[in-house]
Amino acid sequence: MAITVDVACNDTIELSEFIELVDKTSDRLSIDDLLSHAQHLQMLSNNRKFLVDHIVAELKNIHDYQRSNGWNSQIIVLGGVPGKFAVRANVWLPRRMLHRTNADGRKPQFSFEQAHDHNYDFLTVGYHGRGYETEIWENAGECAGEAGERVDLKFLERTTLPEHKVMLYRASKDVHVQLPPQDDFSISLNLLPPPVRGREQYLFDFERSVVTQKFLADSLGQQWLMEAAGHLCDDNISDVLLAISTSHASEQTRRAARRSLARRWPGLADEA
Protein backbone atom coordinates (compact mmCIF):
# COMPACT_ATOMS: atom_id res chain seq x y z
CA MET A 1 0.00 0.00 0.00
CA ALA A 2 0.99 3.66 -0.14
CA ILE A 3 3.47 4.05 2.68
CA THR A 4 3.42 6.69 5.39
CA VAL A 5 7.06 6.80 6.41
CA ASP A 6 7.64 7.08 10.15
CA VAL A 7 10.44 9.62 10.42
CA ALA A 8 10.89 12.33 13.03
CA CYS A 9 13.91 14.53 12.44
CA ASN A 10 14.41 18.16 13.41
CA ASP A 11 17.60 18.68 11.41
CA THR A 12 17.61 20.68 8.18
CA ILE A 13 19.37 20.29 4.86
CA GLU A 14 19.97 22.58 1.91
CA LEU A 15 18.44 21.79 -1.47
CA SER A 16 21.89 21.41 -3.05
CA GLU A 17 22.90 18.92 -0.33
CA PHE A 18 19.69 16.95 -0.83
CA ILE A 19 20.26 16.73 -4.59
CA GLU A 20 23.86 15.63 -4.04
CA LEU A 21 22.79 12.86 -1.64
CA VAL A 22 20.15 11.53 -4.02
CA ASP A 23 22.56 11.69 -6.95
CA LYS A 24 24.90 9.30 -5.12
CA THR A 25 22.16 6.65 -5.22
CA SER A 26 21.78 4.16 -8.08
CA ASP A 27 21.10 5.42 -11.58
CA ARG A 28 17.51 4.21 -11.50
CA LEU A 29 15.80 5.05 -8.19
CA SER A 30 13.92 2.05 -6.80
CA ILE A 31 11.32 2.14 -4.03
CA ASP A 32 14.03 1.18 -1.53
CA ASP A 33 16.23 4.00 -2.84
CA LEU A 34 13.41 6.50 -2.40
CA LEU A 35 12.67 5.25 1.11
CA SER A 36 16.35 5.65 2.00
CA HIS A 37 15.91 9.38 1.36
CA ALA A 38 12.71 9.79 3.41
CA GLN A 39 14.57 11.37 6.32
CA HIS A 40 16.52 13.63 3.95
CA LEU A 41 13.28 14.82 2.34
CA GLN A 42 11.82 15.55 5.77
CA MET A 43 15.00 17.47 6.62
CA LEU A 44 14.44 19.54 3.48
CA SER A 45 10.87 20.23 4.62
CA ASN A 46 12.34 21.51 7.91
CA ASN A 47 14.29 24.14 5.96
CA ARG A 48 11.91 27.10 5.96
CA LYS A 49 14.20 29.34 3.92
CA PHE A 50 15.26 27.47 0.79
CA LEU A 51 11.87 27.66 -0.96
CA VAL A 52 11.54 31.36 -0.14
CA ASP A 53 14.95 31.94 -1.73
CA HIS A 54 13.91 29.96 -4.80
CA ILE A 55 10.66 31.90 -5.18
CA VAL A 56 12.47 35.24 -4.83
CA ALA A 57 14.98 34.20 -7.51
CA GLU A 58 12.15 33.18 -9.85
CA LEU A 59 10.35 36.49 -9.29
CA LYS A 60 13.49 38.46 -10.09
CA ASN A 61 13.68 36.62 -13.42
CA ILE A 62 9.95 36.37 -14.05
CA HIS A 63 10.21 36.64 -17.85
CA ASP A 64 12.13 33.34 -17.95
CA TYR A 65 9.97 31.66 -15.31
CA GLN A 66 10.26 27.85 -15.36
CA ARG A 67 10.96 27.61 -19.09
CA SER A 68 12.19 24.03 -18.74
CA ASN A 69 9.16 22.96 -16.68
CA GLY A 70 7.42 20.14 -18.55
CA TRP A 71 4.66 19.74 -15.93
CA ASN A 72 1.56 21.82 -15.36
CA SER A 73 1.40 25.25 -13.78
CA GLN A 74 0.88 24.08 -10.19
CA ILE A 75 4.40 22.62 -10.17
CA ILE A 76 7.64 24.47 -9.48
CA VAL A 77 10.73 22.56 -10.58
CA LEU A 78 13.42 23.03 -7.93
CA GLY A 79 16.25 20.96 -9.37
CA GLY A 80 17.48 17.43 -9.85
CA VAL A 81 19.61 15.47 -12.30
CA PRO A 82 18.19 15.26 -15.85
CA GLY A 83 17.16 11.72 -16.74
CA LYS A 84 17.60 10.49 -13.16
CA PHE A 85 15.32 12.40 -10.78
CA ALA A 86 13.57 15.70 -10.17
CA VAL A 87 12.79 17.67 -7.04
CA ARG A 88 9.70 19.81 -7.29
CA ALA A 89 7.20 21.78 -5.24
CA ASN A 90 3.46 21.32 -5.79
CA VAL A 91 1.08 24.15 -4.96
CA TRP A 92 -2.38 23.20 -3.65
CA LEU A 93 -5.07 25.89 -3.62
CA PRO A 94 -7.86 25.63 -1.04
CA ARG A 95 -11.39 25.53 -2.39
CA ARG A 96 -11.99 29.19 -1.53
CA MET A 97 -9.10 30.23 -3.82
CA LEU A 98 -10.32 28.34 -6.88
CA HIS A 99 -11.76 30.64 -9.53
CA ARG A 100 -15.31 31.48 -8.44
CA THR A 101 -16.80 31.19 -11.92
CA ASN A 102 -14.56 28.37 -13.14
CA ALA A 103 -13.87 26.19 -10.10
CA ASP A 104 -14.64 23.00 -12.02
CA GLY A 105 -12.30 24.07 -14.80
CA ARG A 106 -9.47 24.69 -12.36
CA LYS A 107 -9.77 21.35 -10.54
CA PRO A 108 -8.07 19.23 -13.25
CA GLN A 109 -5.10 21.60 -13.16
CA PHE A 110 -4.48 20.40 -9.59
CA SER A 111 -5.76 16.83 -10.18
CA PHE A 112 -8.54 17.61 -7.69
CA GLU A 113 -11.41 15.11 -7.66
CA GLN A 114 -9.73 13.01 -10.38
CA ALA A 115 -8.93 9.46 -9.31
CA HIS A 116 -5.59 8.64 -10.91
CA ASP A 117 -2.47 6.55 -10.60
CA HIS A 118 1.12 7.46 -11.50
CA ASN A 119 3.55 5.79 -13.88
CA TYR A 120 6.45 6.39 -11.49
CA ASP A 121 7.16 5.79 -7.81
CA PHE A 122 7.62 8.99 -5.83
CA LEU A 123 8.30 10.31 -2.36
CA THR A 124 6.37 13.32 -1.07
CA VAL A 125 6.37 15.49 2.06
CA GLY A 126 4.10 18.26 3.29
CA TYR A 127 5.94 21.58 3.36
CA HIS A 128 3.37 24.29 4.08
CA GLY A 129 -0.21 24.27 5.32
CA ARG A 130 -2.42 21.39 6.37
CA GLY A 131 -2.23 19.84 2.91
CA TYR A 132 -4.70 18.25 0.55
CA GLU A 133 -7.00 15.44 1.63
CA THR A 134 -6.61 12.22 -0.32
CA GLU A 135 -8.47 8.93 -0.61
CA ILE A 136 -6.11 6.09 -1.58
CA TRP A 137 -6.99 2.78 -3.19
CA GLU A 138 -4.83 -0.09 -4.43
CA ASN A 139 -5.06 -1.48 -7.94
CA ALA A 140 -4.55 -5.12 -7.02
CA GLY A 141 -4.37 -6.42 -10.59
CA GLU A 142 -3.24 -5.48 -14.07
CA CYS A 143 -5.20 -3.47 -16.58
CA ALA A 144 -5.04 -3.10 -20.34
CA GLY A 145 -6.24 0.49 -20.02
CA GLU A 146 -9.43 0.35 -22.07
CA ALA A 147 -12.12 2.86 -21.11
CA GLY A 148 -14.76 1.05 -19.07
CA GLU A 149 -12.44 -1.83 -18.15
CA ARG A 150 -13.15 -3.20 -14.68
CA VAL A 151 -10.24 -3.19 -12.24
CA ASP A 152 -9.72 -4.71 -8.79
CA LEU A 153 -9.58 -1.62 -6.55
CA LYS A 154 -9.20 -2.04 -2.78
CA PHE A 155 -9.69 0.89 -0.40
CA LEU A 156 -6.61 1.68 1.71
CA GLU A 157 -7.14 4.92 3.61
CA ARG A 158 -8.31 8.52 3.65
CA THR A 159 -5.62 10.88 4.90
CA THR A 160 -3.99 14.29 4.55
CA LEU A 161 -0.48 15.55 3.85
CA PRO A 162 0.31 18.11 6.57
CA GLU A 163 3.70 19.71 7.13
CA HIS A 164 6.61 17.22 7.47
CA LYS A 165 4.51 14.08 6.86
CA VAL A 166 6.37 11.81 4.39
CA MET A 167 4.58 9.37 2.08
CA LEU A 168 5.63 7.07 -0.75
CA TYR A 169 3.35 6.27 -3.68
CA ARG A 170 3.91 3.15 -5.80
CA ALA A 171 3.77 3.31 -9.58
CA SER A 172 0.63 1.79 -11.13
CA LYS A 173 -0.47 0.37 -7.75
CA ASP A 174 -1.62 3.30 -5.63
CA VAL A 175 -4.66 5.10 -7.04
CA HIS A 176 -5.79 8.24 -5.27
CA VAL A 177 -8.12 11.18 -5.53
CA GLN A 178 -7.16 14.52 -4.02
CA LEU A 179 -9.52 17.09 -2.56
CA PRO A 180 -8.62 20.77 -2.13
CA PRO A 181 -7.25 21.75 1.28
CA GLN A 182 -10.11 22.91 3.47
CA ASP A 183 -8.66 26.29 4.40
CA ASP A 184 -4.91 26.48 3.93
CA PHE A 185 -2.86 27.36 0.89
CA SER A 186 -0.58 24.32 0.90
CA ILE A 187 2.69 23.16 -0.66
CA SER A 188 4.25 19.71 -0.88
CA LEU A 189 7.72 18.64 -2.02
CA ASN A 190 8.30 15.64 -4.29
CA LEU A 191 11.26 13.46 -5.16
CA LEU A 192 10.55 11.46 -8.29
CA PRO A 193 12.41 9.50 -10.95
CA PRO A 194 11.36 9.75 -14.61
CA PRO A 195 8.22 7.88 -15.68
CA VAL A 196 8.77 4.27 -16.71
CA ARG A 197 8.79 4.37 -20.51
CA GLY A 198 5.83 2.48 -21.90
CA ARG A 199 3.96 2.40 -18.61
CA GLU A 200 0.59 4.11 -18.78
CA GLN A 201 -1.10 6.47 -16.35
CA TYR A 202 -4.88 6.25 -16.00
CA LEU A 203 -7.95 7.96 -14.59
CA PHE A 204 -10.42 5.80 -12.64
CA ASP A 205 -13.99 5.79 -11.37
CA PHE A 206 -13.92 4.47 -7.79
CA GLU A 207 -17.68 3.94 -7.55
CA ARG A 208 -17.76 1.66 -10.61
CA SER A 209 -14.18 0.28 -10.24
CA VAL A 210 -13.38 1.01 -13.87
CA VAL A 211 -10.74 2.80 -15.93
CA THR A 212 -12.21 5.96 -17.46
CA GLN A 213 -9.35 7.12 -19.70
CA LYS A 214 -5.63 7.29 -20.24
CA PHE A 215 -3.96 10.22 -18.47
CA LEU A 216 -0.91 10.74 -20.71
CA ALA A 217 -0.62 11.09 -24.48
CA ASP A 218 2.84 9.68 -25.27
CA SER A 219 1.62 6.12 -25.85
CA LEU A 220 -1.17 7.40 -28.08
CA GLY A 221 1.49 9.05 -30.21
CA GLN A 222 3.37 5.74 -30.37
CA GLN A 223 0.21 4.00 -31.55
CA TRP A 224 -0.35 6.52 -34.34
CA LEU A 225 3.29 6.09 -35.34
CA MET A 226 2.82 2.35 -35.77
CA GLU A 227 -0.43 2.89 -37.63
CA ALA A 228 1.48 5.07 -40.09
CA ALA A 229 4.27 2.47 -40.35
CA GLY A 230 1.77 -0.15 -41.44
CA HIS A 231 0.63 2.10 -44.27
CA LEU A 232 3.85 3.78 -45.37
CA CYS A 233 7.00 1.86 -44.42
CA ASP A 234 8.78 -0.90 -46.32
CA ASP A 235 9.83 -4.34 -45.10
CA ASN A 236 12.85 -2.95 -43.23
CA ILE A 237 10.58 -1.91 -40.36
CA SER A 238 8.74 -5.23 -39.93
CA ASP A 239 11.29 -6.72 -37.52
CA VAL A 240 11.11 -3.57 -35.39
CA LEU A 241 7.33 -3.80 -35.18
CA LEU A 242 7.58 -7.49 -34.31
CA ALA A 243 9.97 -6.70 -31.45
CA ILE A 244 7.64 -3.97 -30.17
CA SER A 245 4.64 -6.30 -30.43
CA THR A 246 6.27 -8.86 -28.13
CA SER A 247 8.41 -6.86 -25.71
CA HIS A 248 7.06 -3.33 -25.21
CA ALA A 249 5.97 -2.54 -21.64
CA SER A 250 2.60 -1.15 -22.75
CA GLU A 251 -0.12 -3.62 -23.71
CA GLN A 252 -1.81 -0.96 -25.84
CA THR A 253 1.42 -0.28 -27.72
CA ARG A 254 1.99 -4.02 -28.26
CA ARG A 255 -1.54 -4.30 -29.57
CA ALA A 256 -1.02 -1.40 -31.98
CA ALA A 257 2.13 -3.07 -33.32
CA ARG A 258 0.23 -6.33 -33.86
CA ARG A 259 -2.51 -4.49 -35.77
CA SER A 260 0.08 -2.87 -38.01
CA LEU A 261 1.76 -6.23 -38.64
CA ALA A 262 -1.56 -7.90 -39.41
CA ARG A 263 -2.35 -5.26 -41.99
CA ARG A 264 0.96 -5.24 -43.83
CA TRP A 265 2.83 -8.40 -42.79
CA PRO A 266 0.19 -10.98 -41.77
CA GLY A 267 2.74 -13.80 -41.68
CA LEU A 268 4.75 -12.00 -38.99
CA ALA A 269 1.60 -11.15 -37.04
CA ASP A 270 1.23 -14.85 -36.24
CA GLU A 271 4.58 -14.69 -34.40
CA ALA A 272 3.56 -11.71 -32.24
Give the predicted meaning of each segment:
Residues 195-237:
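Charged, amphipathic alpha-helical linkers/stalks
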Residues 124, 134-136, 182-199:
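A short hydrophobic beta-strand segment most commonly corresponding to one strand
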Residues 162, 171-191:
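Ligand-binding loop in jelly-roll beta-barrel domains
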Residues 207, 235-245, 267-272:
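Amphipathic alpha-helical scaffolding segments comprising HEAT/armadillo-like alpha-solenoid repeats
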Residues 118, 124, 140-171:
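Short acidic-glycine-tyrosine-enriched beta hairpin
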